[in-house]
């Protein structure tokens, strides 16, 4: 657990990053995952598709990923989970970095990405994926030394009735 005390206008806020171990923590991660995915996909997919992005949809995925070697972490502010990130030690991947809308703009995303990268010391150049329309995340990743190395999945309204705006998943690699 990482703790820090941030002092501003006589108020001390405790924040920490914790390994997801319990069912309650896994459910909190699934809730953040769903909120993050809906936020990122808003404007790019039809409402029906966004409505399907629920914690109940992502909980089995996170549980399966845990079985496959993924490790998930939650960030807490005042004991309330407000961000999540997952890492895979064998492959050097970082995924599922989501910060709640109410917690954005406080450096939590940067802290979580740095935390995740440092959890992979055996991988000099870890990788992550990001939707190209997620410009805020792309800007953060670039500032932190990540570079686009390719495109993966593409979403095309002409080929998928759930998609309303073209986008693609970019792969980024940490270059330092």
Regions found by a protein language model. Give the residues of each.
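Acetyl-CoA-dependent GNAT
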Residues: 20-26, 31-102, 113-115, 119, ...
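Conserved beta-strand-loop-alpha-helix junction that forms the acyl-donor binding cleft
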Residues: 104, 127-138, 154-159, 163-167
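Conserved acetyl-CoA-binding loop of GNAT-fold acetyltransferases
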Residues: 142-152
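Single conserved hydrophobic/aromatic residue that forms the stacking wall/gate
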Residues: 1-15
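Conserved acyl-CoA
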Residues: 111-126, 147
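Short hydrophobic/aromatic beta-strand or adjacent loop that forms the aromatic wall/cage
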Residues: 70, 165-171
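Conserved glycine-rich acetyl-CoA-binding loop
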Residues: 96-114, 131-139, 143-144
């Amino acid at each position: 657990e990482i703790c820090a005390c941030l002092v501003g206008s006589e108020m001390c806020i405790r924040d920490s990053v914790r390994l997801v171990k319990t069912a309650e923590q896994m459910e909190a991660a699934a809730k953040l995952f769903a909120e993050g995915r809906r936020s990122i996909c808003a404007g790019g997919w039809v409402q029906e598709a966004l409505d399907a992005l629920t914690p109940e949809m992502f909980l089995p995925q996170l549980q399966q990923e845990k079985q496959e070697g993924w490790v998930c972490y939650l960030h807490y502010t005042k004991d309330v989970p407000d961000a999540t990130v997952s890492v895979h030690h064998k492959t050097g991947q970082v995924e599922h970095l989501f910060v709640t809308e109410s917690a954005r703009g406080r450096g939590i995303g940067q802290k979580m990405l740095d935390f995740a990268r440092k959890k992979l010391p055996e991988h000099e150049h870890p990788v992550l994926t990001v939707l190209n329309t997620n410009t805020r995340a792309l800007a953060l990743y670039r500032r932190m030394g990540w570079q686009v190395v390719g495109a993966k999945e593409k979403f095309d309204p002409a080929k998928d009735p759930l998609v309303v705006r073209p986008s693609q998943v970019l792969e980024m690699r940490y270059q330092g």
